[in-house]
Curated annotation (Swiss-Prot):
GO terms for cellular component: extracellular region. Contains 3 disulfide bonds. Residues 1-19 form the signal peptide. It comes from Scolopendra mutilans. It is found in: Secreted. Belongs to the scoloptoxin-07 family. Its main location: secreted. The keyword Transferase does not apply. One of its GO terms (molecular function) is potassium channel regulator activity. Residues 20-41 form a propeptide. Expressed by the venom gland. This is Kappa-scoloptoxin(07)-Ssm2f.
């Protein structure tokens, strides 16, 4: 009888605890938010004009300026 209860406990415990944590996938919006946050962090680390991003014939201004959208070459 004790063996029966032990097996029953193990099956119920594994189905409720392990099944609740392993079987449920992570929702896709969480991944999307994480990717967007990484993109924002990349832009925040490099806010200034970079000479290598400027097209041919254009250069960054002498005074360092923060580029919000695209390269700020003049």
């Amino acid at each position: 009888m004790l063996v029966f209860y032990a097996i029953l406990f193990v099956t119920v415990f594994s189905n409720t605890v392990m099944g609740a944590t392993i079987d449920k996938p992570i929702p896709k919006p969480i991944f999307r938010e994480a990717i967007e946050e990484m993109e924002v962090n990349k832009r925040a680390k490099n806010p200034y004009c970079k000479e290598e991003k400027c097209p041919v014939g254009k250069h960054c201004p002498k005074k360092p300026i923060v580029c919000r959208i695209g390269p700020c070459c003049v």
